Amino acid sequence: MAVNGERAVHDENLGVLDRELIRAQSIQGCVGNPQECNSCAITSASRLFLVGLQASVITSGLILQYHVCEAAVNATIMGLIVVSGLWPTSVKFLRTLAKLGRCLQTVVVLGFAVLWAVGCPISRDLPFVELLGISISAITGTVAAVHIHYYNFVTTFNGPHIYFYVMMLGTGLGGLLTVILYMYVSKYEVLIGLCISIVTLVSIVDAATDLQDTCIYRKNRHKQLNTYTDLGFAVVYTQNDRGRVCDHRESSRTLKRVFKGIRIMSVIPPVLYIVTPLMWAISHIIKLNHFIKLTQVTLAVSIGGHIIAFGLQGFAVLYQEKKNLWVIVLYTTTSVTGIAVTFAGISWGAIIILTSTVAAGLTCIQMMRLSVKPIDCFMASHITKVYHVCVYIIINLCYLCGTYVS
């Protein structure tokens, strides 16, 4: 009895120590237990909501660029956004870029609000100097917003499943609702007011850092990696066949090792990201899509791609062993079909390809997260964050192709 009593006291003390180690440092009322902590639950919900709103800011920036920049400039900036996100960086650097981005996007949106208030038209018809200044401001705001999302994405990708899936759903809804408002709200006063409010909300709070500080996030990292360290600093120790102890740091994993076994699935999104705008442009050059209303079609395709991706994700979880195979077969087949239909002179080929690309990009991101080891998640998130942004960039590029080519 004495031994059991001592063991119970030891377990209780261990639990107290765990609570202290995972207790949030900046969230008042945190009790150090995810199942009992209402403060961290409320913080998580509010910060994930802001993560979704950040996608609305990115979409607004892309719409603004469309109105003030030429197609070549738009395409170039989108390419730079992608390239700037490919290089793996430390969490500290991501946080610094996000902090700078929040300041820049606030300054940009307030500047455009002042221009609108004084009656300055925002279009390509302005004198060169004024147009150049407005274009640079629009580009700066968009790039800043994307780098905030990069930090948000890396944070949620390495967090609990619920954080990741809410982020994926929230960013999709944020972008789609912004396009819907742009299409159907005729009063610019309403749009500008919403834009200022949203940018202010997402800029005054560091959503990603707050999410990392919740006891929910800290407990999940301890469960996955057996560590209480912050994101990017985990070290996992293993023993090889020779009995030698090896340390694996999440910040220094190689991409070759991270994507071992899922190489084909990691290649599908970038291939489709390259092929899709080309097919969309070709279909407009040969006048296959002359009857299509571009804004409505790209919106419908975006919604359809998201529905397919999230619907099939549930199906994939039921069949874990063959998940990689069916993803590869499904999206390869639909993409090849779309290409064949396009060259056959049928008008809906490009739409099939774009829908497949949106769904494939989102699905592959989710499948890669399920496939990589916990220690590899941090490095994998640096690539998948670019895949995620590329989904929305490709939609925008296809819209530009249809606008300027037709």
Swiss-Prot record:
Record key words, sorted: Membrane, Transmembrane, Transmembrane helix
Record keyword Transmembrane present: yes
Superkingdom of the source species: Viruses
Bridged cysteine pairs (disulfide): none
InterPro entries named among the record's database cross-references: Herpes_UL43
Pfam family, one: Herpes_UL43
GO cellular component labels: membrane; viral tegument
Compartment list: Membrane
Membrane topology category: Multi-pass membrane protein
Chain ranges passing through the membrane: 48-68, 71-91, 103-123, 126-146, 162-182, 188-208, 266-286, 299-319, 339-359, 386-406
Sequence similarity: Belongs to the alphaherpesvirinae HHV-1 UL43 family.
Protein name, entry field: Membrane protein UL43 homolog
Lineage: Viruses, Duplodnaviria, Heunggongvirae, Peploviricota, Herviviricetes
